[in-house]
Amino acid sequence: MTEKRAVILLSGGLDSATVVAMAKAEGYSCYTMSFDYGQRHRAELNAAARVARDLGVVEHKVIGLNLDGIGGSALTDSSIDVPETPGEGIPVTYVPARNTVFLSLALGWAEVLQARDIFIGVNAVDYSGYPDCRPEFVEAFERMANLATKAGVEGQGFRIQAPLQNMSKAQIVQAGMARGVDYSLTVSCYQADDEGRACGKCDSCRLRADGFKAAGVEDPTRYF
């Protein structure tokens, strides 16, 4: 039987951990990729490693990027405060072109691995309004992937899978629980401390807490 491989973007947060579990349940051999991109919440990298071990991925790779050299986001520029109340429009926690960059590197690894599926945990229901989390972006990137690669041109098409795209945060939590995700291993907070404890105030913390509450599941998040 031919091995079915997938490259999965794993941040270490709730959504991406759920996606790994979903892909594994579908019979994929999972290869996870995380990024040390200068984010202020580097505790998520430790969380990603924990999740990868717990879910038994084949290989977990961490790629170094200096997106903090570009700046323009509260997640990569310490001079920009992380908002603690909801605002209008695209928030300052948006990292310019982040998912485009991440998916491009995942695409390169997928081509080397001869994997045809790339999974990303973006969501367009309970989310912060980032433009690179929308279905239109995912569809456009898939078209580009099949135009810009040797494998794509030779007819071995890539699929960009975003299984959480139309799910509420509560539905995501329920899907993960059904597949054995240990959410105590994950970190979602934009300004988590070195031990992975959360602030409980940022947009990501609010979405996470609301998701557990709506799902009727005890929230294992630790706060500072």
Curated annotation (Swiss-Prot):
<feature type="binding site">
    <location>
        <position position="199"/>
    </location>
    <ligand>
        <name>Zn(2+)</name>
    </ligand>
</feature>
<keyword id="KW-0436">Ligase</keyword>
<dbReference type="GO" id="GO:0008616">
    <property type="term" value="P:queuosine biosynthetic process"/>
</dbReference>
<dbReference type="InterPro" id="IPR018317">
    <property type="entry name" value="QueC"/>
</dbReference>
<keyword id="KW-0479">Metal-binding</keyword>
<dbReference type="Pfam" id="PF06508">
    <property type="entry name" value="QueC"/>
</dbReference>
<keyword id="KW-0862">Zinc</keyword>
<dbReference type="GO" id="GO:0016879">
    <property type="term" value="F:ligase activity, forming carbon-nitrogen bonds"/>
</dbReference>
<dbReference type="GO" id="GO:0005524">
    <property type="term" value="F:ATP binding"/>
</dbReference>
<feature type="binding site">
    <location>
        <position position="205"/>
    </location>
    <ligand>
        <name>Zn(2+)</name>
    </ligand>
</feature>
<comment type="similarity">
    <text>Belongs to the QueC family.</text>
</comment>
<feature type="binding site">
    <location>
        <position position="189"/>
    </location>
    <ligand>
        <name>Zn(2+)</name>
    </ligand>
</feature>
<feature type="binding site">
    <location>
        <begin position="10"/>
        <end position="20"/>
    </location>
    <ligand>
        <name>ATP</name>
    </ligand>
</feature>
<comment type="pathway">
    <text>Purine metabolism; 7-cyano-7-deazaguanine biosynthesis.</text>
</comment>
<comment type="function">
    <text>Catalyzes the ATP-dependent conversion of 7-carboxy-7-deazaguanine (CDG) to 7-cyano-7-deazaguanine (preQ(0)).</text>
</comment>
<keyword id="KW-0067">ATP-binding</keyword>
<dbReference type="InterPro" id="IPR014729">
    <property type="entry name" value="Rossmann-like_a/b/a_fold"/>
</dbReference>
<feature type="binding site">
    <location>
        <position position="202"/>
    </location>
    <ligand>
        <name>Zn(2+)</name>
    </ligand>
</feature>
<protein>
    <recommendedName>
        <fullName>7-cyano-7-deazaguanine synthase</fullName>
        <ecNumber>6.3.4.20</ecNumber>
    </recommendedName>
</protein>
<keyword id="KW-0671">Queuosine biosynthesis</keyword>
<keyword id="KW-0547">Nucleotide-binding</keyword>
<dbReference type="GO" id="GO:0008270">
    <property type="term" value="F:zinc ion binding"/>
</dbReference>
